[in-house]
Amino acid sequence: MDKNMERDTQQGTISQEAPADSGVSRRSFLRKSSVAAMAAAVGSQIPFGDLLPEGMQLVGMAHAEEAMKIEGKIPEMVVLNTKPLNAEPPPHFLDEDITPYNKMFVRNNGIPPVKVDAAAWKLTIEGESAKRSVSFSIAELKKKFKEHTLQIQLECGGNGRSEYNPPAKGNQWRVGAISCAEWTGVRLRDVLEHVGVKDNAVYIGYYGADTHVSGDPKKVVISRGVPIAKAMEDESLIAWAMNGKDIPLLHGYPLRLVTGGWPASTCGKWLNRIVIRDKVHDGPKMTGMSY
């Protein structure tokens, strides 16, 4: 069992998003917000705090950044948000042919499951365009279908958002929300064909085991998908391993979708359900304003 799977990876509760309609730079916003927060904590103003130059920070702020380090990741990771956890490496760390776990960006929409029993995990394939409903254990996936290992690039659809003009809402990614790891699993096509796909199939959608940030178990965090033609392509995988090891919890242990060539938001983590649709999937965050 993956040693990462029982870790609670949420580090603190400080959001580092700047308002999209702000006229100040993100760095200036963060610096001023941090100074204001520290002033409130100590009960007095920080002398000349509003004049702190770019690149300079108060000692207390430096200690706060230390507390936001992510276990298993390089200390240079830039944490954009902590609930949900989103972080990226500085781009100069991404010069290796295969991106290692410790330098891979983290993009969450909800709270990852804290404990995972991989032996009991089930993936259910169903939907109005499925000929039947079938559930697979991970052991059954490994036994029934041919294994494939592919090196696939994943990139957040918001990568580079901090440079948008006019500014856009959301995590202010620089350009580190991209990775190129090796993924091992079975082709999504093989599993779908085993279940049976009706002629009217248009899309597939995924569901995962993460929890909504509100804590409401009835709310679906995110459920995106891809056209059925994309689902049937060779590089669309149901993966259980990354770089030759169990997928780390932060990246979707024990199962995730990997759909090469499409935004990483279509690569559902903690995968436990796939629906075959007779229309464009309409799950949460499938609309044009959600990415």
Q: What function would you assign to each model-found segment?
A:
Residues 1-28, 51-56:
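N-terminal secretory signal peptides
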Residues 149-177:
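Short, conserved helix/loop micro-motifs enriched in His/Cys and acidic residues
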Residues 177-184:
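Mid-length scaffold segments of soluble, non-membrane domains
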Residues 254-291:
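Catalytic cores of secreted or luminal carbohydrate-active enzymes
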Residues 221-247:
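Acidic, His- and aromatic-enriched active-site or binding-groove loops in soluble protein domains
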Residues 193-230:
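Gly/Pro-rich turn-and-neighbor structural signature
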Residues 19-23, 44-99:
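C-terminal segment of N-terminal export signals and the immediately downstream linker at the start
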Residues 25-46, 188, 257:
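N-terminal export leaders
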